[in-house]
Regions:
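Double-stranded beta-helix
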Residues: 1-11, 107-134
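A short, N-terminal "cap"/entry segment at the start of jelly-roll beta-barrel domains
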Residues: 1-59
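Short histidine-centered beta-strand/loop micro-motifs
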Residues: 36-38, 56-63, 80-81, 89-90, ...
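Short, charged/polar surface micro-motifs in flexible loops or helix N-caps
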Residues: 42-43, 52-56, 73-77, 84, ...
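Short, surface-exposed beta-edge/turn micro-motifs
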Residues: 44, 65-68, 114
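Short, conserved beta-strand element in jelly-roll/cupin
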Residues: 63-78, 82, 119
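Structural motif
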Residues: 75-77, 96, 115
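Short acidic-glycine-tyrosine-enriched beta hairpin
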Residues: 82-102
Length: 134
């Protein structure tokens, strides 16, 4: 019954389903996740938890839906690149949250270990290298 969300994410799908996923440590996790849940389309959500000890090395975006990020411990600084190229920054402490809108590139910085809960429209997620930090 009990499992570690950081190791085994949940898929929230059509029909109010909540399906535990295989280990996120599998190198093919995201590709296999998309294949398993593509029929849920933009309404499916991946619920995951990650602990970070270093700034992200990539930008990412979720073209098919918004992402909720909830800081559960530590401090996380989230950067969102707007369509006009400007960057908005939000610093989250435990209990704070931010929404990454659909299609908005985002990345994050930490200076000490921090943990966040993510609820993501994960199918179609894109990544690009990160060239700078703030």
């Amino acid at each position: 019954l009990v499992f570690r969300l950081a190791s085994f994410p949940i898929h929230l799908g059509l029909g109010a389903t909540a399906v535990r996923q295989p280990s996120i440590e599998d190198k093919d996790f995201f590709e296999a996740y998309a294949a398993r849940h593509t029929s849920d389309g933009a309404e499916g959500r991946l619920v995951s938890m990650f602990t970070f000890s270093q700034p992200w090395t990539v930008w990412e975006r979720h073209p098919r839906g918004a992402e909720l990020v909830v800081c559960t411990s530590g401090t996380i600084t989230v950067h969102q690149e707007q369509a006009d190229g400007t960057v908005q920054t939000a610093t989250l402490h435990a209990g704070d949250a931010v929404v990454n809108p659909p299609g908005v590139w985002h990345t994050a910085d930490v200076t000490a270990p921090a943990t966040a809960l993510f609820i993501t429209a994960g199918i179609g997620t894109e990544h690009r290298p990160r060239e700078s930090t703030w």
